[in-house]
Amino acid sequence: MTEPAPPSRRRLGWKAALVCAVLGGITLYFSLPTPERDIRQAIIVALRAELTPAMIDRALDDGDVDGAELLADAADLAGIGLPKPTADRLRAANSLWKQALGKTADCAKGAVMGTASGLAGIVCSVAADMTLLGDVRDATTELTKPLRGEEPDSLILGLAAAGIALEVAAPATGGSSMAAKGGTAVLKVAVKSRMIARRLADEIGGILSSAVHLGPVKAMSASDLADMPRASRTLGNAVDMKRLAPLAEAGTSLGRIYKKADGATALMVTRTARSLDDVKTAEKLAAIFGKRTGGVLKALGAKAFDLVVLALRLVWALLGLLIGALCWLVSALVALRGMIRLIRRLLRRSASLEQPA
């Protein structure tokens, strides 16, 4: 009867199997497409299929110069050339003096009033809303509406309270909550300027209705509102931070988009996103396309979010295939080694039986 293989030889066999598995895994890994490359390719293919110069002409016909600029930027990204008449119209609409006058007025309105009718205004408005003053101003505006026979907007009031609570929480969170505050500032300006998708606004409203207790807030008197420290304290204490977490998470993504790209891109996200999940997906788009993300969303709409999700699912599916292939490879190598050892034993036993006694 043959002796079993020594431990050193068995260890050598396992090492050989592991080396083969690692080499196979490396080969499969580098053959996998990266999410960024897949997302970029999918977006560009979709732009080439759906974006036409006529869309830019229609935007100019409607007086939407900002939208026409975004579409032209997306066309440039996809390598779509513009006919000379369209390019000339866009150039004329973007003449320096027209844009300077319009954007300066919109910026002033956004900074002072907190509302905006254009992309320049929202940038200035968000900058103003990044302070306690902006949130207290908006809360005061809403809380004094009943004196004018108007109904307060609970969405704006809730976002103002959330912004204050996130700023108050900044020291305890090491400043990380300020990114979420940036996102809530963008959302608040988008709501005031009617630049937010209805489904997204409804989801945000649902979260705020459970996270913000408006009873104590609505009970504030005029003197309370005039005292900024007291008003800030009352508004901040009205927020349940745990229930606000889903909005804060998406707000963080929106705040990062604002920093990585610009206010125009963040605005396009609020106008296009169907849910807070779409807002978080938009952060991946912004990481790849930067300031051109706004043009992608203007041209493709919510389809851009679906393309990102599809590309990520494909990568995860291929990763699962990789893990399965590695497991199969290791199992096959171990089984092959066992078969070889068995054959060797049988051959040795056969040879020993054939030897004369």
Question: What does each model-found stretch correspond to?
Answer:
Residues 10-13, 101-147, 161-162, 168, ...:
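Compositionally biased, low-complexity segments of secreted and virulence-associated proteins
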Residues 67-72:
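Solenoid-repeat scaffolds in large eukaryotic assemblies
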Residues 13-31:
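Hydrophobic membrane-insertion alpha-helices, especially the h-region
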Residues 55-59:
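Conserved small-residue packing positions in alpha-helical repeats and bundles
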Residues 32-53, 183-186:
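Alpha-helical transmembrane signal-anchor/signal-peptide segments
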Residues 74-93:
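Short, charge-rich amphipathic alpha-helical segments embedded
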Residues 1-9:
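N-terminal Lys/Arg-rich, disordered targeting/topogenic segments
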